[in-house]
Amino acid sequence: TNKEVQDQSYNVVMDVVRRYDVDGVHFDDYFYPYGDGNFPDDDTWGEYQKSGGSLSREDWRRDAVNTFIERLYEGIKKEKPHVKFGISPFGIGRPGNPRSILGFDQYAILYADAHLWLKKGWIDYWSPQLYWPVNQIPQSFPVLLGWWSKENTMGRNLWPGMIIGGKTDEKGADEIINEIMIERGFVNDAPGHIHFSMRVFLKDSSALNAGLKAGPYQHQSLVPPSPWLDDVPPDPPRMSATVANDSTVLVTWSHENAKDVFRYVVYYQYEKNWEYTILNSQDRMAALPYSRTVIERARGRQRGDPAQPKVEYVIRVAVTAVDRVGNESAPAVQTMGRSVIPTLQ
């Protein structure tokens, strides 16, 4: 509620945005502190009343938080439109939303009107801290996720927060993987999620790490696009693919507007199946295995007959460019051994 404090906080964040090539600004737990409510704002509250302010003290505090959130979002977009702003609020909007949910009321106690920020679209991604298990009925992960998804009427990226501390054994890993698969089924286009915290992954958390690598994280993924920021994809790259030593496909590419590219994706097709690899903007070459051996059952064979190995070769290669907000270009495609440039299916 103190304007000088708000200005200083705003200026510090904007200084980082201006001077550094950041992807985004993240606020974790942005609200009044937990405690008994004795926040030391008597002076600014008195000044507000003397100036003719008509809000209750609770609404006045919430309004100060709302004003800062909106101001910061607009400031970031004016300075660098591609820099995302996201918040990770307490996971319960308010008790009773939806009806079965019980627990802490951040609106009344922390003066955080998180629901309003989402409704107004003052964020680019939304990561409510859904730190409760699937079967904890008063704070059920899927029930809360479904409610936030329904309330996301501005179509921002919904990336629920999942706590992984203390969940590194097999039982804990199953809980996290179940939450990920529920999120992928509940939320349109399965945009992703955020884990708290990275320290757990850096330790020897074999059950969790192994389960994620073998399950939901076995494939690379791109950050989802943010079409409200920009929905114009970059131009396709120029590419060439050649077979070297009958074992490797060497793919090279260039881009006329390389400064607009954040990632490249190289797709390659073995007969009917496409594979891909995601590379950084500085990369200009990829070496792909020209062949692979698969085991399949030949047509007409009976059950119990041994499966036969089959060698498949790369028949098409494609390269796309991805910009800072996640827009992917049309592909540049080459059919191996031919000069025809077909459409990527």
Predicted feature locations:
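Polysaccharide-binding and catalytic clefts of secreted carbohydrate-active enzymes
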Residues: T1-W122, Y131
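Substrate-binding cleft of secreted/luminal carbohydrate-active enzymes
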Residues: Y111-I137, W148-L229
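Proline-enriched interdomain boundary motifs that mark the N-terminal boundary
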Residues: D231-S240
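Conserved aromatic anchor
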Residues: S247-D260
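Extracellular low-complexity, O-glycosylation-prone stalks/linkers
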Residues: K259-L279
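Solvent-exposed serine/threonine-rich low-complexity stretches and specific carbohydrate-binding patches
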Residues: Y276-P289
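Beta-strand-rich modules
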Residues: I295-S329
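Extracellular fibronectin type III
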Residues: V322-L344
